[in-house]
């Protein structure tokens, strides 16, 4: 390796905030099912603690050995609605507490998989789990929850969409003392993926191995610095520059994943190619788009800039890694991106533009704070719009929205840490209640019939 490449890597880490955002261990709990809920919970705790006992230590050892910051060590598990559904329990909050206790025992930041897959309908376990989400998130610290309400193959379950509007509202009320923090740990998906390493939407799919390591990379600052060097050049050059930069970022993710896999004795799953921002200055996806020539993110041209970025990152990343997966799209969480926060405050970025950007990235309405008096029906309608984009375009889309109790447009909601600060954004004042009240299913699109 040439000296200038070594120096470039050091600069990327030290100055441009290149890091591994997460090493996530996916653990199957299918062998923990039991008719007795208490027995099932003991099995779950035992399996998680056994499998993930060395996860944090190995992550820290890799950090020291390679000098690469690894921000989060996390766990994802089989959707609990499936596991708990075999028990006679009528409330699953105790399962959430078990996950929380296991996460604390092994020292991980978050554990995902308090989840239900209801894109076509409910099982008994799904119904109980979804009802219990607000209490589960209010009574735990590290548990993340997700619900898949639609897919290209099945259409959109509008009964589930309506219920998730109510669940988000109740979760915000129950966690009002932390400005609705529970909602930051709850994602509603269409076309959810089984190998996502990022929270809050991670769960371990039933088609996955017993235990795997998935890696999520992050490098918005590196990409921005690279684009600075091609100022005024045509888009062909910009795309090629992003592609080459993404290759380098993903190579590092591949290395970390393989080393972690060997040290833990667990198969290596995938690298997720998503560019994940943080609230830190110089770690913003919005600033990448602005570097391409936009005065501020949200103006006309933003969606096109995001499309170029997203596609070039994927092309570079696929070349660098044998197995890519997860969401693999740019993340645009408002509260976690300094450039996004500024654009909202300046009036350049609104919910409608973020919805348009969803057509390009994975989680379009992500970490959005809306007024506390936003109705459950309006929240459900926002979910329905996002799900429709995903279902029609055959891609993952999601919503993570926080109707923080007692807030109004222009207020700031403070979450701290990686979750950042969210300006409260206005929602459309006209009602969608009669639309949401219809229920039923929106049928799958005509192009879903592939066989």
Swiss-Prot record:
> At the top level of its lineage, which domain of life is listed?
Bacteria
Question: Which residue ranges does UniProt annotate as crossing the membrane?
Answer: none
Q: Which Pfam families match?
A: DUF711 (PF05167)
Xref: InterPro entries? UPF0210
The record's section on NCBIfam families has: PRK05313.1
Q: Which PANTHER family match?
A: UPF0210 PROTEIN MJ1665, UPF0210 PROTEIN SPR0218
Family membership:
Belongs to the UPF0210 family.
The UniProt subunit note reads as follows: Homodimer.
Question: What name does this protein carry?
Answer: UPF0210 protein lin0538
Provide the taxonomic classification.
Bacteria, Bacillati, Bacillota, Bacilli, Bacillales
